[in-house]
């Protein structure tokens, strides 16, 4: 026998739950660093030296989430260091004023003293980053009008657009004896060509590892150093002189990498070096660690499968995932032009930190292109509903089936795409020869016939993943007929006579007669077409749609007056003034 509820069940979170103890978002470190260890880890002396030399006044400190607990102590160390320097400078300048000097030296010292009084640096700790923690957050730094950003932790080293940066990679301890033992077991032949590299947080150990291996008898080693060049043969690392002269000779070298590298680096080097061995640093101390051979075959095959899936996508979304990397606006324009040249439509989005929930709201988009740093552009997650690719992968996806050849080469830095020379025409003189001679009329007539029969004569496109025929993969090419040579020659005559002759007018009339394409402001919109044909719910506001001249449905009902609906709770509703419950 069931009992009736005296009150409705509680379906919300209690108000006092916020006062209860919850798990911390950032895990606590095992131990608190001493002041000396903190100064070494965060490179306080070098940071103070660079701030004093450049005389920065407003300094922004950017920490990743795992280093935020140390941010107040780092702030105090930097503040005390700058104040102590000011006191020392003031005392030294006061002593020099008592010494006999000539007028020129005395005036110069007074100018220096005036500058020292005006130079009062201020430090700011940036809160949450707008994008990835590996990138410099110039947007947050501009909120405090910063002159420089001190970036802590690992970084992608992408060049910034506006502000100078002081990189502090922090120092991490690394036992060298296990590293040397693992290296000798992996490469027993001392003549093997091996490049030594490490993650940026362990890069300061590379010179010591190199010197000790040379003492062991290894003669064909190269120790990399950090450089700010993501477009390098080895991104952000120096390479041997022989590789600078002939980049393809990098295939004769093997790579020994300390700590787990980012996936973008592995994919980039997979086709450039002979082999990659990774020395893990996340294992327990005191245990024998064996380097693991890197294998990127599965990841590369999955990336290529994504490209074949996107070859027939009609609408692309451009995700701007950075506002700080240099030349990001140029690559946005480049990607937009490439998509438009392929007859497809693109929409641009600025979403901040990328996650699956944000991009899932736009079901019209068939694929996403990320514009970001060379590390964050690679999004290899299965949580996203639609594929997310890089600008390099877009170049491959937009090629035809007969041109798309997957060689295994992969790159994530978009600057290398911008540096590529523009494609040259096969025969530069053809355009001039076509406009001369009596056969120009026949040539123009052939172009007119091609323009009229373009949709019918275009080769069919199939989705290589499903095998289905795709009839709507290039909506912008079909909706915007190209202008033939005869149309350009008779443009003035058509304007004077007001005639609507030519194949373009016939095609435009045929398109309007079909009524299959959604128009917004007399312009074809693939997004509106998707909303009209595939979405079952178009949202509220039919009056607004009519006023904006947006036609989604020819059978759309007119708006009606607002009437009183149901009211009550889930146990029973009443309609209008009726007392009956439903």
From Swiss-Prot:
Stretches the record annotates as Disordered: 416-467
Coiled-coil ranges from the UniProt annotation: none
Binding positions for [4Fe-4S] cluster per the UniProt entry: 135, 156, 373
GO cellular component, one term: 2-(3-amino-3-carboxypropyl)histidine synthase complex
One GO term (biological process): protein histidyl modification to diphthamide
Needed cofactors: [4Fe-4S] cluster
Cofactor note: Binds 1 [4Fe-4S] cluster per subunit. The cluster facilitates the reduction of the catalytic iron-sulfur cluster in the dph1 subunit.
Subunit annotation: Component of the 2-(3-amino-3-carboxypropyl)histidine synthase complex composed of dph1, dph2, dph3 and a NADH-dependent reductase, predominantly cbr1.
Designated name of the protein: 2-(3-amino-3-carboxypropyl)histidine synthase subunit 2
């Amino acid at each position: 026998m069931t009992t009736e509820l005296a009150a409705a069940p509680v379906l919300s979170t209690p108000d006092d739950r916020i006062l209860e103890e919850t798990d911390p978002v950032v895990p606590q470190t095992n131990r608190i660093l001493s002041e000396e260890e903190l100064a070494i880890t965060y490179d306080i002396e070098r940071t103070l030296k660079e701030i004093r030399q450049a005389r920065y006044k407003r300094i922004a400190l950017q920490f990743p989430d795992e280093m935020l607990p140390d941010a107040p102590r780092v702030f105090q160390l930097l503040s005390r260091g700058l104040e102590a320097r000011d006191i020392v400078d003031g005392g030294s300048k006061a002593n020099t004023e008592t010494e006999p000097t000539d007028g020129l030296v005395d005036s110069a010292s007074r100018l220096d003293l005036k500058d020292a009084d005006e130079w009062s640096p201020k430090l700011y700790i940036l809160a949450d980053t707008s994008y990835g923690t590996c990138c410099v957050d110039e947007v947050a730094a501009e909120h405090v009008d910063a002159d420089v950003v001190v970036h802590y932790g690992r970084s992608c080293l992408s060049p910034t657009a506006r502000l100078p940066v002081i990189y502090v990679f922090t120092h991490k301890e690394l036992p060298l004896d296990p590293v040397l033992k693992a290296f000798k077991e992996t490469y027993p032949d001392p003549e093997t060509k091996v490049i030594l590299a490490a993650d940026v947080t362990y890069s300061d150990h590379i010179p010591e590892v190199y010197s000790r291996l040379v003492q062991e008898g290894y003669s064909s080693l190269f120790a990399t150093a950090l450089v700010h060049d993501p477009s390098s043969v080895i991104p952000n690392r120096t390479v041997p002189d022989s590789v600078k002269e002939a980049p393809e000779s990098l295939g004769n070298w093997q790579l020994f990498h300390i700590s787990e590298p980012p996936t973008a680096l592995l994919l980039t080097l997979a086709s450039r070096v002979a082999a990659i061995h990774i020395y893990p640093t996340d294992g327990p101390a005191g245990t024998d660690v064996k380097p693991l051979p890197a294998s990127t075959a599965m990841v590369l095959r999955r990336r290529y499968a994504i490209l074949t899936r996107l070859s027939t996508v009609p609408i692309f979304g451009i995700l701007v995932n950075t506002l700080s990397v240099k030349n990001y606006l140029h690559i946005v324009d480049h990607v937009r032009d490439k998509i438009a040249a392929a007859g497809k439509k693109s929409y641009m989005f600025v979403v901040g930190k990328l996650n699956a929930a944000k991009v899932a709201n736009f079901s019209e988009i068939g694929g996403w292109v990320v514009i970001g740093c060379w590390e964050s552009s690679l999004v290899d997650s299965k949580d996203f509903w639609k594929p997310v690719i890089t600008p390099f992968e877009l170049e491959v996806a937009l090629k035809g089936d007969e041109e798309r050849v997957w060689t295994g080469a992969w790159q994530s830095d978009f600057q290398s795409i911008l540096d590529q020379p523009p494609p040259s025409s096969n025969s530069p003189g053809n355009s001039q020869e076509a406009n001369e001679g009596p056969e120009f009329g026949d040539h123009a007539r052939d172009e007119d016939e091609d323009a009229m029969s373009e949709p019918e004569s275009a080769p069919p496109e199939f989705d290589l993943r499903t095998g289905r025929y795709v009839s709507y993969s290039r909506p912008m090419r079909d909706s915007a007929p190209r202008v033939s040579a005869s149309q350009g020659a008779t443009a003035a005559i058509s304007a004077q006579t007001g005639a609507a002759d030519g194949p373009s007018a016939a095609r435009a009339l045929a398109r309007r007669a079909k009524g299959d394409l959604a128009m917004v402001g007399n312009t074809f919109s693939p997004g509106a077409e998707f909303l009209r044909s595939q979405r079952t719910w178009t949202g509220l506001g039919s009056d607004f749609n009519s006023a904006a001249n947006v036609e989604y449905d020819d059978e759309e009902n007119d708006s009606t007056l607002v009437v009183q609906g149901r009211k009550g709770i889930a146990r029973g509703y009443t309609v209008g003034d009726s007392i009956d419950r439903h």
